[in-house]
Amino acid sequence: MDPALLTPMMQHYVELKRQYPHAILLYRLGDFYEMFFQDAQRVSRELELVLTGREAGAIGRVPMCGIPYHAFDRYAAQLVAKGYALAVCDQMEPADQAKGLVRREVTRVITPGTVLEEELLQARQNNYLAAVVRLKGSKQAPCRWGLAYADISTGEFWVCQSEGQEQLEQELARLQPAEVLLPTEEGLGLGLIRPGDPQKPLGLPNQYAYTLRPAEPFELAVARENLMQTYGLRSLEGLGCEGLPLAVRAAGGLLHYLEETHSPQRCVAPKTLLQPSPQGGHPLLPPPRTYQLTDYLILDAQTRRNLELTQTIREGAFVGSLLWVLDHSRTAMGGRTLRRWLLQPLRDSEQIRLRQDTIQELLENPSLRARLGSLLDSLYDLERLANRVGSGTANPRELVALGSSLGKLPQLAELVGEAKTPLLQSLQQVDPALVDLGRRIEHTLLPSPPPILTEGGLIRPGVDPELDRLRQQVEQDRQWVAQLEKSERDRTGIPTLKVGFNKAFGYYLSISRAKAHQVPKEYIRKQTLTNEERFITPELKEKEARILTAQTDINQREYELFVQLRQEAGSRAEAIRQVAQTLAAVDALFGLAEVAVQQGYTRPLLTTDRRLIIEEGRHPVVEKSLPQGLFVPNSVQLGSPHGPDLIVLTGPNMSGKSTYLRQIGLIQILAQMGSFVPARRAELGLCDRVFTRIGAVDDLATGQSTFMVEMNETANILNHAGERSLVLLDEIGRGTATFDGLSIAWAVAEYLATQVRARTVFATHYHELNQLETLLPNVANFQVVVKELQDRIIFLHQVQPGGADRSYGIEVGRMAGLPQPVIQRAEQVLALVEKHSRIGLGLRNQGKSQPAQKNCKKEPAPNRSPDPAVGDQLSLIPAPLFPD
């Protein structure tokens, strides 16, 4: 497009668009943000807005779409949620003061991962920006990768380096980043790839927004220099990432992106994200912290989904998830902390014990718990407020919220004065500077200031002498105007005379047209309306000028005082953030204590051995959804020296097998996140991973059938589980033919019991697997029992030793309302199948076994040496599942 064919304004628009080709450019024109060309068409389609046009010069009309400036947050939130980046161009001077074209500049770039505005964020979820650097692997070695992620709204910054594509995808699934940065060496051009776009980076899920960046900021030397310069370091040893080059590269690329999207030339805030405040202080993002995957209990995406940790499987709803049961925290920052703990349980028994101790103290002191809850209720989101003041973007109401929250710190310190646990004791140490800052904010700002900075109404009386003088002058002049109405009525004899004001004409004298003949000669007619005439006088205009000038000075002075106060708060951002993190942890543990009291949870004993003992365990979500006392508790014991490693669980459909599996997994996760658990007693060995294979779904996007998905997930478990893992399997093999399914189920159970030795519960309708108990010493049979009546069955939901020999599928079909002819025919077919089943005959006849071939090719797996004693047992497995 030839710029010479465009109007000057459109030339400027096109020039800015070339600087931000991958963002939607919102161009401020008066009271609207306008978009043109393809941006207008895209936004019109995405937001269902009217697409209009505008004359652009010699090329004629071009597509145009606009949003009102006062509705910017609402529309911007929708676009960011859809994965778009926004470049916001604002007017930098009033239109009536411009000499020629109004000066406009891009003041901020908003991308899905760089959002700071409260309206664009979810209160109880982090908004992570991630950066990934990958080195391709080979058949002999897995790929290596570095990951950095940050939430610039809360000040979190973490780095990690590991290997394996699956492990990288698991971390991304845990974080659910709003945006992922990749260097262009990943094989695609620069730009933003929105969620669901088929043009995704090779080998990565397409559910995230990817931003392809220049490779240079991700180079090791450049990234090291960026990190050291940003944080004033001479080396990276203090950060713990000196020996993690891929993590350093990812962190450097992430910092460069933030510098670019929040650079001083593009930001109207007093300071930028990574620029220290004038008073010293720290950058908005603190130095990154390093972690290892092995520090935490690993939960893959399938396990998080199957156990419904944060949302239900069917509706994707929060209500009905484990987090719904647990989240009794009183603040948004406490809710975010609890969510992180749930998705990243610990493996460090000492850290777990510290959390348990805090919950225990709150449980044993109801008065402390009640008063603490009341104080937490009065706190605002200090984590995000810290970063809002740190970035210089906090509005007056946010600063008032900060002052109010800081003012509660002395009360919190007094409340926990006799606390015994370290976390509560840490609240006793209050930074006097933060208390003083809170008082200064409360003494400076009015309690309910307007959201707009430049319209006054911010500062309390008595704070600034010059401001008080100006306000007094305005008040005196306004009193004169008010008295003018009475004096002019008396002087003119017009009782309906009024003094009015509007932005177009300022002050005026309003007189009805019926009395217009009584108007004094010195009145100057300004406007004629249907029923009234409006006049001004020289004296009234003089007072108006004084009032308006003084009001402008007042607004400017209030703005200056507010910015000074915000900068003072910004210099304390790091201290506020540290206090906020402590309070968030206390709030999360307070919520867990509340749940423990309300639901009758107990403190689990965490051990370093493999024992998993749960007495009268309960499913936390199902229990809460039922009337009190109706849930039937059940026990389990795995991994003991003389107990089973694998339980074969049989029982009817609808009896509660899946609930039993899930509650075991949930109790283990709750224990390792530091929570109390829904059980009478629990003694749990620390797990390294929890695996689940529950439910059946297909994956149409990748062309995988239900059974293929099931086999992929099962293969993942068999190749990665170890003896410290917990494995929960439900109906392996049901998605294919009976013989194939039974064979696979048998082989999987056998492999888990003899090779992996993970603590496993294997729910199945293949009752033939009950034979494993007699063949393998570390396998036991359990069943979910029912009570049979003459015409129906009653589900008791009780798990007891022994194997079931019926699934009662026809009875469940009858309960579901299948037509009676179908039920009768099913019973006839069942009788024939049971009588002539070659599977049943083979098992009853106990034929000879055929040992598995040792030279079969299989997926790579951890090096496992079979126990010779177990090998001897394999020869006892009945072979004629497929008799000759």
Curated annotation (Swiss-Prot):
The Gene Ontology terms for molecular function here are:
ATP binding; ATP-dependent DNA damage sensor activity; damaged DNA binding; mismatched DNA binding
Region described as Disordered = 843-884
> Which BP terms from GO are recorded?
mismatch repair
Annotated organism of origin:
Synechococcus sp. (strain JA-2-3B'a(2-13))
Q: Which ranges form a coiled coil?
A: none
Q: Which UniProt keywords apply?
A: ATP-binding, DNA damage, DNA repair, DNA-binding, Nucleotide-binding
| Pfam families, per database record | MutS_I, MutS_II, MutS_III, MutS_IV, MutS_V
Similarity comment text for this entry: Belongs to the DNA mismatch repair MutS family.
Q: Which CDD domains match?
A: ABC_MutS1
Residues annotated to bind ATP: G651, P652, N653, M654, S655, G656, K657, S658
Any idea what job this protein has? Answer: This protein is involved in the repair of mismatches in DNA. It is possible that it carries out the mismatch recognition step. This protein has a weak ATPase activity.
Protein name (Swiss-Prot/TrEMBL): DNA mismatch repair protein MutS
Its lineage opens with:
Bacteria, Bacillati, Cyanobacteriota, Cyanophyceae, Synechococcales
The cellular component terms of Gene Ontology attached to this UniProt record, alphabetical and capped at eight, are:
cytosol
